Amino acid sequence: MQKSPLPLRIFLAVLLFVCLPLAALARTPPSLGTISVSELPQEARVTLRLIQSGGPYRHRQDDSVFGNRERILPVKPRGYYHEYTVETPGAKNRGARRIIAGDKPPREFFYTDDHYQSFRRIKE
Protein backbone atom coordinates (compact mmCIF):
# COMPACT_ATOMS: atom_id res chain seq x y z
CA MET A 1 0.00 0.00 0.00
CA GLN A 2 1.45 3.34 -1.04
CA LYS A 3 1.51 6.18 1.52
CA SER A 4 0.08 9.57 0.65
CA PRO A 5 2.68 12.24 0.01
CA LEU A 6 3.33 14.45 3.03
CA PRO A 7 2.03 17.68 1.41
CA LEU A 8 -1.29 16.00 0.60
CA ARG A 9 -1.67 14.73 4.18
CA ILE A 10 -0.87 18.20 5.55
CA PHE A 11 -3.41 19.77 3.19
CA LEU A 12 -6.11 17.29 4.24
CA ALA A 13 -5.37 17.86 7.94
CA VAL A 14 -5.64 21.65 7.53
CA LEU A 15 -8.84 21.26 5.53
CA LEU A 16 -10.33 19.08 8.27
CA PHE A 17 -9.46 21.57 11.02
CA VAL A 18 -10.94 24.47 9.03
CA CYS A 19 -14.13 22.77 7.82
CA LEU A 20 -15.30 21.04 11.00
CA PRO A 21 -15.77 24.26 13.02
CA LEU A 22 -17.51 25.89 10.05
CA ALA A 23 -19.91 22.97 9.79
CA ALA A 24 -20.76 23.29 13.48
CA LEU A 25 -21.46 27.00 13.03
CA ALA A 26 -23.80 26.27 10.15
CA ARG A 27 -25.98 24.13 12.45
CA THR A 28 -26.05 26.60 15.35
CA PRO A 29 -29.48 28.26 15.48
CA PRO A 30 -29.46 32.04 15.24
CA SER A 31 -29.85 33.94 18.47
CA LEU A 32 -33.37 35.07 19.19
CA GLY A 33 -34.25 38.64 19.86
CA THR A 34 -36.85 39.58 22.45
CA ILE A 35 -40.03 41.60 22.41
CA SER A 36 -42.06 42.71 25.41
CA VAL A 37 -45.79 42.11 25.61
CA SER A 38 -46.38 45.87 25.43
CA GLU A 39 -44.42 46.02 22.14
CA LEU A 40 -46.56 43.33 20.49
CA PRO A 41 -49.29 44.39 18.07
CA GLN A 42 -52.73 44.52 19.73
CA GLU A 43 -53.81 41.38 17.82
CA ALA A 44 -50.84 39.46 19.22
CA ARG A 45 -51.71 40.51 22.77
CA VAL A 46 -55.26 39.21 22.19
CA THR A 47 -53.87 35.89 20.89
CA LEU A 48 -51.50 35.62 23.87
CA ARG A 49 -54.42 36.07 26.30
CA LEU A 50 -56.42 33.41 24.42
CA ILE A 51 -53.50 30.96 24.66
CA GLN A 52 -53.10 31.61 28.38
CA SER A 53 -56.82 31.05 28.97
CA GLY A 54 -57.02 27.92 26.80
CA GLY A 55 -59.03 29.35 23.89
CA PRO A 56 -61.42 29.31 22.11
CA TYR A 57 -59.44 29.79 18.91
CA ARG A 58 -60.73 31.14 15.62
CA HIS A 59 -58.71 28.91 13.27
CA ARG A 60 -58.72 25.12 13.22
CA GLN A 61 -54.91 25.10 12.87
CA ASP A 62 -54.51 26.96 16.16
CA ASP A 63 -53.08 24.84 18.99
CA SER A 64 -51.61 22.43 16.43
CA VAL A 65 -48.09 21.10 16.88
CA PHE A 66 -45.40 23.36 15.44
CA GLY A 67 -42.58 21.21 14.02
CA ASN A 68 -39.75 23.79 14.24
CA ARG A 69 -38.41 22.47 10.91
CA GLU A 70 -36.54 25.73 10.43
CA ARG A 71 -34.59 24.98 13.63
CA ILE A 72 -34.66 28.65 14.60
CA LEU A 73 -36.25 27.98 17.99
CA PRO A 74 -34.38 25.92 20.59
CA VAL A 75 -34.55 22.22 19.66
CA LYS A 76 -37.14 20.39 21.77
CA PRO A 77 -39.00 17.09 21.40
CA ARG A 78 -41.83 17.00 18.86
CA GLY A 79 -45.04 18.21 20.47
CA TYR A 80 -43.33 20.77 22.70
CA TYR A 81 -44.26 23.73 20.48
CA HIS A 82 -47.79 24.72 19.39
CA GLU A 83 -48.72 27.47 16.95
CA TYR A 84 -51.42 30.11 17.09
CA THR A 85 -52.60 32.64 14.50
CA VAL A 86 -52.21 36.34 15.16
CA GLU A 87 -54.93 38.08 13.17
CA THR A 88 -53.70 40.43 10.45
CA PRO A 89 -56.14 43.25 9.62
CA GLY A 90 -57.09 43.18 5.94
CA ALA A 91 -55.63 39.71 5.29
CA LYS A 92 -57.89 37.29 3.41
CA ASN A 93 -56.09 34.30 4.92
CA ARG A 94 -54.31 33.61 8.22
CA GLY A 95 -51.50 35.96 7.30
CA ALA A 96 -47.86 35.61 8.37
CA ARG A 97 -48.06 36.42 12.06
CA ARG A 98 -47.97 33.66 14.68
CA ILE A 99 -47.28 33.05 18.33
CA ILE A 100 -45.49 29.80 19.12
CA ALA A 101 -46.00 28.49 22.65
CA GLY A 102 -43.58 26.08 24.26
CA ASP A 103 -44.61 23.35 26.73
CA LYS A 104 -48.02 22.43 28.13
CA PRO A 105 -49.19 24.46 29.91
CA PRO A 106 -47.28 27.08 27.90
CA ARG A 107 -44.24 28.48 29.71
CA GLU A 108 -42.47 30.29 26.89
CA PHE A 109 -43.74 32.23 23.91
CA PHE A 110 -42.24 33.36 20.60
CA TYR A 111 -43.58 35.85 18.06
CA THR A 112 -43.03 35.83 14.29
CA ASP A 113 -44.39 38.38 11.87
CA ASP A 114 -42.73 36.86 8.79
CA HIS A 115 -44.13 33.32 8.78
CA TYR A 116 -41.35 31.51 10.66
CA GLN A 117 -38.39 33.26 9.01
CA SER A 118 -37.46 34.88 12.34
CA PHE A 119 -38.68 34.76 15.93
CA ARG A 120 -38.50 36.94 19.00
CA ARG A 121 -38.96 35.58 22.51
CA ILE A 122 -41.86 37.29 24.26
CA LYS A 123 -40.82 38.60 27.65
CA GLU A 124 -43.61 39.23 30.08
At which residue positions do the language-model features occur?
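Bacterial N-terminal signal peptides
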Residues: 5, 9-21
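N-terminal secretory signal peptides
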Residues: 26-74
